[in-house]
Amino acid sequence: MAKGEGHILAQNKKARHDYHIVETVEAGIVLTGTEIKSVRATRIQLKDGFAQIKNGEAWLVNVHIAPFEQGNIWNADPERTRKLLLKKREITHLANELKGTGMTLVPLKVYLKDGFAKVLIGLAKGKHDYDKRETIKRRDQERDIKKQMKHYNAR
């Protein structure tokens, strides 16, 4: 873990399965008070989420943050779009990468860094079905090798 990077609150394991991650960028998230309480309680889902760039600003879309149970009328919409805090040059770089290619921005994980909620955004290209099968096959082979090594070393 990098200095200051703390507790991982949510991970998007499906993203690494469905996409080739080309580049990652750390971004802050604009959250309301009850949303940050829900995030700290790990009540966040990244599975269907993605990021997009509109009018020179980055936005996180389709990320579900469950309503805070004690928040009553101050709870925000669980599916609302949330602004991502990135530097201008990072936004322009990502916007240039997204133009004309089959690239997308997916959230990979949410964690706390020095008390602030951060999201790791991945610039990703979609995998084909045969790529997914190849990844699964490679993972199974590595698992079998580890199992055999463990059995061999136990003798």
Swiss-Prot record:
Lineage of source species: Bacteria, Bacillati, Bacillota, Bacilli, Lactobacillales
Pfam families according to UniProt: SmpB
Cellular component terms per the entry's GO annotation: cytosol
Subcellular location: Cytoplasm
InterPro entries: SmpB, SsrA-bd_prot, SsrA-bd_prot_CS
Organism this protein belongs to: Streptococcus pyogenes serotype M5 (strain Manfredo)
PANTHER family noted in UniProt: SSRA-BINDING PROTEIN (PTHR30308:SF2), TMRNA-BINDING COMPONENT OF TRANS-TRANSLATION TAGGING COMPLEX (PTHR30308)
NCBIfam families per record: PRK05422.1, smpB
Listed GO MF terms: RNA binding
Keyword Cytoplasm: yes
Keywords: Cytoplasm, RNA-binding
Coiled coil: none
SUPFAM superfamilies hit by this protein: Small protein B (SmpB)
Family: Belongs to the SmpB family.
Name the UniProt record assigns to this protein: SsrA-binding protein
GO biological process, one term: trans-translation
Summary of the function given for this chain in its UniProt record: Required for rescue of stalled ribosomes mediated by trans-translation. Binds to transfer-messenger RNA (tmRNA), required for stable association of tmRNA with ribosomes. tmRNA and SmpB together mimic tRNA shape, replacing the anticodon stem-loop with SmpB. tmRNA is encoded by the ssrA gene; the 2 termini fold to resemble tRNA(Ala) and it encodes a 'tag peptide', a short internal open reading frame. During trans-translation Ala-aminoacylated tmRNA acts like a tRNA, entering the A-site of stalled ribosomes, displacing the stalled mRNA.
